Amino acid sequence: MNEVTEQLLQAGVAGKLVIDLSTLLPADSEAIAARVTAGGADFVDCPVGGTVAPALKGQLLGMAGGTEAAVARARPVLDLLCRRVEHLGPAGAGSRMKLALNLPLALYWQALGEALSLLRGSGIVPETAISLMADSSAGPTVLRNRTQVVLDTLDGTDQPGTFDIAGLAKDLRLALALGQAEGLDLPVSRTTEQRYAAALSQGLGGFDGASLSRRAAG
């Protein structure tokens, strides 16, 4: 993003609106905002929740940071992409919320695999286990929406991910970096990050998070 920022500043941004949809550390978003606004532009950081399919339908979840005026100016654009845009505070607030939002998802795939490991040798088949989990409070939206992907993965065929292991690992590392910068202890996240690092070393970066579950299930 720094390279893109430099190119924008060199081209001149006075009077323009810059919207950053990427997921960054809040401090990085704040630094970009300072440079862009110093150049005379409005800046909004608005990382989004969702993948390609909801984006095409305008069904993303937008988490916006910036001044009231900048976010108001950005809304006509963001409303084309998002079913909901929440203004969370100054620049960097959107990035902070996005990291908080993605952290439980990254942890979930490891937790799902560990839960399934309890069923090894029991005769309970994955189809039944996943169906029950998806039909209970143990089943987040991602499990209900991606049941077949999870089952195919558990059956032995890793599936391409719309939000793949590499992306999950990147956001998990950013969350840990944010926690460290603020003196927070995130023990579950630290341990899970090691599992993601191992998965990346095995060449699984392009696959769905369920591939992490499969390895954890054994």
Residue ranges of predicted features:
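Short, well-ordered coil/turn elements that cap or connect secondary structure elements
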Residues: 13, 38, 80-82, 121, ...
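Short, proline-enriched alpha-helix->beta-strand connector loops that line the catalytic pocket
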Residues: 15-16, 115
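Rossmann-fold dinucleotide-binding core
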Residues: 2, 17, 23-102
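Residues within well-ordered alpha-helical secondary structure of globular protein domains
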Residues: 7, 35, 80, 135, ...
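A generic fold-level signal
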Residues: 13, 55-56, 204-207
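Glycine-rich, highly charged phosphate/nucleotide-binding loops
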Residues: 1-7
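Short, conserved loop/helix-junction motifs that constitute active-site signature segments
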Residues: 8-14
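Helical "substrate-binding/catalytic lid" subdomain
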Residues: 94-216
